C-alpha cells in the first residue's frame, strides 16, 4: 500500500492527474502499540509537534535528510530522506514498512542502509 501526504509544493492540480489520494495534511497508522503520525513536515515537525502520545512516531520528510532519533517520552522521529532532491550528501532514498520494521533504502539499488523495528 502506498501512503501519501501533501507536501509544501503540492496543489489540487496534482490530485487531478493521480488515481490515489495525495492531498491529506497527515495520516495516522497504527503499528503494534504505537501510532505513526505521517506528515510532510512543513507544518508539524519536532519543534511543532502534532498530538503524540508517549511512544508514538513522527514521520516526515521535509528536510530531505534520512533520520531516526528518539525524543520526548519514548517517541521517535523518522525521515525517509528524498527520492528526488536529497540534501546534506545523503543518498536518494525511500522508506518501507513491513509488519513493524522500517527500512531505509537507496533508490538506485534498493540496498538497505538502516533498519528499525518499532
Label each PLM-derived region with a short phrase:
Residues 25-32, 71-72, 77-118:
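Binuclear metal-dependent phosphoesterase catalytic core
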